[in-house]
Amino acid sequence: MAGNSFGQLFRVTTFGESHGLALGAVVDGCPPGLEISEADLQGDLDRRKPGTSRYTTPRREPDEVKILSGVFEGKTTGTSIGLLIENTDQRSKDYSDIKDLFRPGHADYTYHQKYGQRDYRGGGRSSARETAMRVAAGAIAKKYLKQVHGIEITGFLSQLGPIKAEAFDAAQIEQNPFFFPDAGKLEALDQYMRDLKKEGNSIGAKVQVIASNVPVGLGEPVFDRLDADIAHAMMGINAVKGVEIGDGFAVVEQKGSEHRDEMTPAGFASNHAGGILGGISSGQDIVVSMALKPTSSITVPGKTITTEGEATEMITKGRHDPCVGIRAVPIAEAMLALVLMDHLLRHRAQNQGVLTHTPQLR
């Protein structure tokens, strides 16, 4: 399994399984001198961790991160940063009944066919539990981006099932368990999730993440375009089935006269492109949306097969999120931060001294 690392100059490698002893990450390429502590990482981990509300899995993991290396006297040294989170609330017995069958809609079948075996406890390596380390590593990138470049990254749930945010209040995002920016829809969300829980079912969601104050020039055409790497990062998150940059699939119904982001001496007149032109950041807000499927771990009976190919029926046991999109918000923020951090370092390496007389637009 070679796909455990992400990034080039700012590179993150993760390890660990859902019900293993621990999860870990090695972060390479962080510039020296950045003030960082476990508390800086813990904030985002607390936003992602399970058991924080009745709308997420009841598995209770403190997700307390330990910095093992790469930080001395409160500052990064420029060497590899080692991170570790211990698993403390595994209930592997919940999965003993399904070790010989495949959960439909999960990675059980494909992992088994590819590797000839699989860790059936909570999905093993394929579990979203692994994303805790991405969030921890992303918190390092987020602090550097904000402290050195003033870049702010904000994620939120823009849609849960049929309920869409029709208003945007940034102050609301961290004030409710849905990371939802529209206070007028919170009661409807609560009732919808209550009904869903009674059904024993799950639902999909849409998450949006915005990066502000991104400098113009990030992105390495043609194969490492900024939007291509962002899409790669977001599609690497569990349950993500679609990614949009800017207006995304809505451009199908737009005319060129409508879609083009006209330029004036005062700046861009619109941002249909989502802050990226020709694979390079334009200096506008980078706007990314992703669609997450409903988890197949539900108590509604479903058809499947055993490892021997025999037909059977199953009801999922264990502790699961009825909407995985809720806890995906800090994960999406982290992945966008990792991409921007990597591209900032790559841009600096090749284009540090490039100057133009053209004004930079916003």
From Swiss-Prot:
Matching InterPro entries: Chorismate_synth, Chorismate_synth_AroC_sf, Chorismate_synthase_CS
Binding site for NADP(+): R48, R54
Catalysed reactions, semicolon-separated: 5-O-(1-carboxyvinyl)-3-phosphoshikimate = chorismate + phosphate
Molecular function as annotated in GO: chorismate synthase activity; FMN binding
Keywords from the named record: Amino-acid biosynthesis, Aromatic amino acid biosynthesis, FAD, Flavoprotein, FMN, Lyase, NADP
PROSITE patterns: CHORISMATE_SYNTHASE_1 (PS00787), CHORISMATE_SYNTHASE_2 (PS00788), CHORISMATE_SYNTHASE_3 (PS00789)
SUPFAM superfamilies linked: Chorismate synthase, AroC
Similarity annotation: Belongs to the chorismate synthase family.
Name used for this protein in its record: Chorismate synthase
